[in-house]
């Protein structure tokens, strides 16, 4: 933890290894075929179970949370301490990929609560998840395909609810380039904003945290690849 008083770790319950087998029909070093096996978990197989835990450095006391909110896990990832050392956050991807949660563990008593929940009756595209905690500790920028397009939302951490949608429209946010917290701007790439050209052409944009002031930084027609200067005052576009 930032105050060096606690350590976060992960308790793992392993599972029996499962394999698939395949035949190499014409190996280079012999006439007979070879049988090979590869470790591979198939649909329905039990997966390793992970529990993020917190330990006090001085006393060795273990703070082990209830697993109720992350029981059916496909994967647990991105554990990170908050700067005040009071909580640990991590991402929970439910098996089946229809529920995705950002969970917070109290470093005092192990209480777990969701600060963001993403659900779909079809599929949560977890490969496109983006999360950024603002320095004020109160707001989180989050990406979601909940309206069938990938857009950015501002979340209130205390309530776990979105306060507003930052980007919106029938277009797709691709990558976040920079979060400028001082001036409250987001720099990002997107495709499909311009309805009169190829919807897969990528351009670069800037928008305010409040969702206002969308600015096209690469207005020329066509697809773009940009590199920004450190102060975000200049870009090289190819």
Language-model region placement:
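A short loop-to-beta-strand structural motif that recurs across blades of beta-propeller domains
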Residues: 51-53, 101-103, 151-153, 203-205
């Amino acid at each position: 933890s930032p105050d060096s008083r606690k350590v976060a770790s992960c308790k793992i319950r392993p599972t029996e290894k499962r394999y698939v087998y395949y035949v190499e029909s014409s190996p280079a070093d012999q006439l007979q075929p070879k049988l090979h096996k590869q470790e591979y978990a198939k649909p329905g197989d039990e997966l390793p179970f992970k529990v993020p835990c917190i330990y006090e450095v001085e006393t060795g006391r273990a703070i082990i949370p209830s697993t109720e909110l992350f029981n059916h896990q496909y994967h647990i990832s991105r554990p990170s301490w908050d700067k005040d050392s009071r909580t640990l956050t991590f991402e929970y991807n439910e098996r089946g990929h229809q529920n995705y949660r950002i969970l917070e563990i109290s470093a005092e008593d192990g209480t777990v609560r969701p600060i963001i929940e993403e659900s779909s009756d079809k599929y949560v595209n977890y490969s496109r998840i983006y999360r950024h905690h603002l320095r004020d500790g109160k707001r989180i920028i989050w990406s979601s395909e909940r309206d069938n397009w990938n857009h950015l939302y501002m979340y209130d951490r205390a309530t776990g609810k979105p306060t507003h949608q930052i980007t919106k429209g029938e277009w797709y946010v691709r990558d976040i380039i920079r979060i400028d917290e001082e001036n409250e701007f987001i720099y990002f790439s997107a495709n499909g904003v311009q309805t009169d050209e190829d919807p897969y052409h990528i351009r670069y944009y800037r928008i305010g945290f409040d969702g206002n002031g969308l600015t096209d930084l690469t207005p020329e027609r066509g697809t773009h690849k940009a590199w920004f200067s450190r102060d975000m005052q200049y870009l090289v576009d190819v």
